Amino acid sequence: MIDVKELLKEYEYVTPEIAENHGISKYKFYKYVNENHLKKAGHGIYRSDDEWQDELWILHKRCSSAVFSHDEAFYYHDLTDREPLVHTLTTYSGYNSHRLTADGKCRVYTVKKELVDVGKTIVSDNFGNDIPMYDLERTVCDLIRSRSSVEVQDFNAVLKSYISRKDKNLNRLMEYAKLFRVHNVVRKYMEVLL
């Protein structure tokens, strides 16, 4: 039978659910956590003290309905070289994001529930963990939708980076733009930049 120490080697982070899936009771799990002084990385998420903390994965575990977007996606897709100061996520309207934004490390955007999964993909972060993030075209739509809160030079740099990419999909971009009701604005920017 596998123990918590082996789970830590395999997963880097452990939760009571992971332990239960491997036949370890909650009692044994929390006993191991207390005896070995595991560090609490988030609500119900533990790691050994010598591991670096994967903040993106922890945020994903804290709010599984949210998708990394905006600044986080710009940086991941190499549309900007500026690493985000705060993590940006998108979730559905009505989600209580107070716990995510309370520490000032996150900014949460909201959309209609049926639009949350538009353009959602699973990517590997710097630690090799899978996290949800929007694809290039959804990221550009998010940029244009929130253009009033983005600095002009950042806005222009991200759009120019997208236009210069070989893997851009303008048809998908226009499809998403119609869903988010920004197709006229997107068309205007694309006509100028292309």
Question: What is the predicted role of each segment?
Answer:
Residues 1-12:
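Short amphipathic alpha-helical interface segments
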Residues 13-18, 45-194:
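Nucleic-acid-binding surface
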Residues 37-42:
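A short, conserved structural fragment
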Residues 22-34:
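Short amphipathic alpha-helical interaction segments
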Residues 9, 22-23, 64:
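Short alpha-helix boundary/capping motifs
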Residues 6, 19-20:
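Residue-level marker of alpha-helix boundaries and capping positions
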